[in-house]
Structures are given as C-alpha cells and as structure tokens.
C-alpha cells in the first residue's frame, strides 16, 4: 500500500484495509520500539505541529511519536503567538510552514480546516481535530487499543456513553466500527442522542444498534464501555448543558454487574464521568489507550513520510 | 391546447418546464431574474402535469441559460427541463441533472465551516438525490433540501 504523501483528514476517507494496515504497522513499530528503545526511520525529517486550539495528549503524543522515529519537531500550541493574530489566512500559514517541514499536523477550531490545509500544502497533512468534525488519529488509536486488549474487534459488544450528539470522537469511532461485526449500545441522555443520520447510516451498514438512556441495564452486555465527557464548550446554550451535566458516572457500584473482562475506555480529559476508584480495577483501559497514541501516530507519520519501507 | 402553450410562445430565450408547483418564485430568484432590467418573464403556475401532478413553467425572453445556471435550478427543481428557443424553434433541450459535485453555488450553512471564513470555493458532494442530501466537502456536515433552499 503506497502511503507516501497521503493526507489523513477524515475516517471517511479510509477503507477497512487502510485501517487494518495502519494498525498492523503500529503494532510492528511498538514491538521494534520495545526491543530497541528508539528508532531512526525519520532521521532528518521535520514535523510541524500547528495547534490553533489547546491540547495536551494529541500534541505531545505526536511530538513523542516523531522523536521516537528519530525525527524532529517545530510548531506552536496556540494561535495567539503567530501571525494568525495579525490576520494571516490559514492558507498562507500553511504555505509558509510547508517550506520549513516535511509533514504537518494541524488542530483547528473550524470544521474543514484540515481538509483546506491539505489542499493547499504539497506535503502530507494529518488532522488532529477540526472543530466538532473529525479526529481520525484518535479513532485509529481507539481501534488499536481495542484490538490489543481483545485480540480482535469482530464479535464485540461496545457501549458508547455520554455526549453522543456533539462528540466528534464517538461519531468517527462509530463510523469506523461499522466496518466490523459489532453490536453497539448508544447510551446517552435524551438530549444528547447520536444524530439520526449517523444511526441510520450505521444500521444501513449492518450494525446492530441499540439506543438507550439506561447505563446499568446495558452494562452486563458490554465488552467495551467507551465513556466521553459532556463538553461544555460545544453546547449552544448553558441551560442545555446544565440539564445534562453529570448525567452518568461510571463507578464501582455501576460496574458491579459488568463482565469480568469489560474494558472501560475514555479519550480523556475526564471530569467526573469516571470515578478515580475505577482506575485501579482491571476494567480501566484509558491510560493504556493514551499509550496507544504513540505507536499509532508513529505509524501515520512514518507512512505518510514514506520512510518505513512498507 | 398543449399545457406548455398556455402562456405565449416566446421568439427567443429559455423555457423552464417541470418546476415543482409553487417554486417559480424561488427559481427566478436563484437565476437573478427579479431585477427590473432582467427582461420579460412569462409565468404559469399550478399547471396540470402528467409527470408532477401540478407544475410551474417560467419563460425567459431574450436570455439563454448557461450550464452552471441550470445546475442551480437542479437543486430546487430536479425534474426541470430546459428548452432554448431561437426564432420560435427549440434549438437545444436539456434535462436538468444534479451533478455528483456542486461547486460555487451554495454556501455551507454551518457558520463554523472553514469555507465561510477563508478564501475558498464552497464544494458539496451529492450523497443522495431523493431526498436530496449534500455533504460539505470541508466540514463534512450533511444538508437537506430545506437548508439547501435557504442557502442558495
């Protein structure tokens, strides 16, 4: 599969074969990294991280991934320290940055910004989140985490919990899971149900989808519970946010009827939707999930740069 | 009398037939024909039609529609047929078809879409024709017929 020069913008651009390929390369890199400590596939290559919006995990794990591949990193982590503040267009910023680097990772508050950046740039662009639209590398690392934990994705029953209306992570994860033979429980308050067009699309693609507000009723059936934060910043008005804030909390009480093998995931940051008492249980997979960000992003950087020889 | 002759024959111009009943005003707005210097328009509304039940017809004197303009009509009147008339004769006939991609006609209704903030031509992919559903090339949001009509 030739990935050199390819952009990673939306999970919608990926086939199942593409996804499986990235996961396989990530696994190989993780093994190599464990053996050798550091790699040098990307020696002499420069990654530019353009974060127009704050992030902890995504930016640091991309930077860590590039360093672990032997490359180096330039970039900024807030738009306020750049010429964007002087009114520079996104297109001009991208045309400038591509002169200094070999691959660009961008997070931007506007939907479609990464697609536009990819059209303007002659070097590969990887989307690290565009407004409420897509965050494809998160989806790939989520799939990688599930596959590592269970050895497979097919045959699993997966619950998505929390803000299914505004959460971009759950939208693209659900779309990617539709490639597999899974059952999905969509658990949310009425106000935050998954948009109908996505639910319809999942059903059309053959996924068994159950929508419910009842977390405790769904828990015994699940192999994976994917929890998301109810994001205040995505709500059009405060009143709607207050109505649903704190609707669910995953704690030991809630988990008492869960399968022994249930794994709880979360894209983080969390607020109060998973009680810290869950962290020490065998159910907690969310910090392992954070770790997966590095090999998956190493795979994407290495593939788009064309330095892995695959 | 044939239904499309209910209004006077035009010597030269464009006849847009099979517009859904009641949509003629929207059609002339989209085509920019409501301006005072836009030329003579002949309109028939709520005409019985075998194909549509009821339909509207707009005849535009002295103006030939380009393909890009026809695409604009396709969004509001997907069954429309366009006849170009010269010397009282139909010299060209097109069936309006919704293209796979729509560029530069429609604005994205998502205020946070990058296409509303940067110097970029709006682009949409047609997801379904019946009912009409488009997906913004940039923000990937889907828009339905009502939103399309509001943003034309």
From Swiss-Prot, chain A:
GO cellular component: cytoplasm
Positions bound to carbamoyl phosphate: 57-58, 107, 135, 138, 268-269
Residues forming coiled coils: none
Domain of life from the UniProt record: Archaea
Pfam families, per the entry: OTCace, OTCace_N
UniProt GO BP: 'de novo' pyrimidine nucleobase biosynthetic process; 'de novo' UMP biosynthetic process; glutamine metabolic process
Pathway assigned to this chain's UniProt record: Pyrimidine metabolism; UMP biosynthesis via de novo pathway; (S)-dihydroorotate from bicarbonate: step 2/3
Family: Belongs to the aspartate/ornithine carbamoyltransferase superfamily. ATCase family.
Xref: HAMAP family: Asp_carb_tr (MF_00001)
Subunit (UniProt): Heterooligomer of catalytic and regulatory chains.
Protein name: Aspartate carbamoyltransferase catalytic subunit
Native organism taxonomy: Archaea, Methanobacteriati, Methanobacteriota, Thermococci, Thermococcales
Swiss-Prot record, chain B:
Cofactor: Zn(2+)
InterPro entries for this protein: Asp_carbamoyltransf_reg_N (IPR020545), Asp_carbamoylTrfase_reg (IPR002801), Asp_carbamoyltrfase_reg_C (IPR020542), Asp_carbatrfase_reg_C_sf (IPR036792), Asp_carbatrfase_reg_N_sf (IPR036793)
Gene: pyrI
Keywords, comma-separated and alphabetical: Metal-binding, Pyrimidine biosynthesis, Zinc
Self-association state and partner proteins as the record states: Contains catalytic and regulatory chains.
Name of the molecule in the record: Aspartate carbamoyltransferase regulatory chain
Keyword Zinc (UniProt): yes
Record-listed Zn(2+) binding positions: 108, 113, 136, 139
Pfam families: PyrI (PF01948), PyrI_C (PF02748)
NCBIfam families in the record: ATCase_reg (TIGR00240)
Family: Belongs to the PyrI family.
Co-factor binding details: Binds 1 zinc ion per subunit.
Keyword Zinc: yes
GO molecular function: metal ion binding
Function description: Involved in allosteric regulation of aspartate carbamoyltransferase.
GO biological process: 'de novo' pyrimidine nucleobase biosynthetic process; pyrimidine nucleotide biosynthetic process
Entry's transmembrane regions: none
């Amino acid at each position: 599969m030739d990935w050199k020069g390819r952009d990673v913008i939306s999970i919608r651009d990926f086939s199942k074969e593409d996804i499986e390929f990235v996961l396989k390369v990530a696994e190989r890199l993780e093994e190599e990294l464990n053996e050798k400590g550091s790699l040098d596939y990307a020696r002499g290559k420069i990654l530019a991280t353009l974060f127009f919006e704050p992030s902890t995990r995504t930016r640091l794990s991309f930077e860590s991934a590039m360093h672990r591949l032997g490359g180096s990193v330039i970039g900024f982590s807030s738009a306020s320290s750049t010429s964007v503040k002087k009114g520079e267009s996104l297109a001009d910023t991208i045309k400038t940055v591509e002169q200094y680097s070999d691959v660009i990772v961008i997070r931007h508050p506007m939907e479609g910004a990464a697609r536009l950046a990819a059209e303007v740039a002659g070097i590969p662009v990887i989307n690290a989140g565009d407004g409420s639209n897509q965050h494809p590398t998160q989806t790939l690392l989520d799939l990688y985490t599930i596959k590592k934990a269970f050895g497979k994705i097919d045959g699993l029953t997966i619950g998505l919990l929390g803000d299914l209306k505004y959460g971009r992570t759950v939208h693209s994860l659900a779309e990617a899971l539709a490639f597999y033979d899974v059952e999905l429980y969509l658990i949310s308050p009425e106000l935050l149900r998954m948009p109908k067009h996505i639910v319809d699309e999942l059903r059309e693609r053959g996924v068994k989808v159950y929508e419910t507000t009842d977390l405790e009723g769904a828990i015994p059936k699940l192999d994976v519970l994917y929890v998301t934060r109810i994001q205040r910043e995505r709500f059009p008005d405060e009143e709607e946010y207050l109505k649903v804030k704190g609707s669910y909390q995953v704690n030991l009480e809630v988990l008492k009827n869960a399968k022994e093998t249930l794994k709880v995931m979360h894209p983080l940051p969390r607020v109060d939707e998973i009680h810290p008492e869950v962290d020490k249980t065998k159910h907690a997979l969310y910090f392992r999930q954070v770790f997966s960000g590095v090999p998956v992003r190493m795979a994407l950087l290495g593939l788009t740069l064309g330095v892995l020889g695959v | 009398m044939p239904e499309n002759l209910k209004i006077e024959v035009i010597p030269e111009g464009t006849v847009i037939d099979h517009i859904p009943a009641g949509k003629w005003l929207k059609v002339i707005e989209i085509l920019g024909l409501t301006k005072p210097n836009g030329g003579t328009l002949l309109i028939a509304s709520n005409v019985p039609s075998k194909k549509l039940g009821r339909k509207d017809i707009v005849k535009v004197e002295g103006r030939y529609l380009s393909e890009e303009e026809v695409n604009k009509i396709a969004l509001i009147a997907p069954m429309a047929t366009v006849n170009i008339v010269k010397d009282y004769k139909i010299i060209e006939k097109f069936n309006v078809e919704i293209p796979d991609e729509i560029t530069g006609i429609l604005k994205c209704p998502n205020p946070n879409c990058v296409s509303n903030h940067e110097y970029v031509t709006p682009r949409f992919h047609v997801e379904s024709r019946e009912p009409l559903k488009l997906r913004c090339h940039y923000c990937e949001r889907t828009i339905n017929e009502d939103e399309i009509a509001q943003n034309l």
